[in-house]
Amino acid sequence: MQLHLSTWPEVEAYLAKSKAVLIPIGSTEQHGPNGLLGTDALCPEIIGKRAGDEAGILVGPTFNVGQAQHHMSFPGTITLRPSTMIAAMLDWTQSLARHGFERIYWLNGHGGNIATITSAFSEIYHGVSFDRSGANHPPLRCSLRNWWELPGVMDLCRQLFPVGEGSHATPSEVSVTWFGYPQAVKSVAMTPRIAPNGPILDADDYRRRFPERVRRWSFVGASGYCRNRLG
């Protein structure tokens, strides 16, 4: 069940039996010449929808823009300031809590979001603590899980891609998006097939160091190995 494809009476009926909602959260940023800009949002969205269908959990609209300032030299990347993202997550959560949701499960697809999501949770809990009527309200709980940390995921990734899995524009995450959106598969020559490693400082430094094969930073993946059937 997806919130944005539901009516308000359907959501009201859902709340009568469950107070939980899953929110996919990610980023819109470059993932190299064959990886979709929405990869970090699409992966938790695809996985979250499947999990929601199987478990009967409501899945909210995807929070698809996050912390991507270091990718801003690559066209199409969109980023938020940490303060903006925290404020948006706070309003998002309070809106859901106002309707009666008590368990908000954020399924994350972008490592760069983790610190800001954690800070947002602190803001949310501070708000609850400072609300003098808080003791009369049902407990509100927020949870964060990165999709690649779900049970068995990394073992499967290493099994499918024993060389070059990396941590950005990985063959596993690109394969998930190709599985979900086969019409968007990009066929691009990858030379070398495994991207070089290296530190970056900021957006311009990133583009200077990796002007063509643009998806990489430390321990970047070999997205030349991805296949939609492996998603």
Regions found by a protein language model. Give the residues of each.
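Extended, histidine- and acidic-residue-enriched regions that form the cofactor-binding/catalytic faces
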Residues: 1-83, 87-103, 109-231
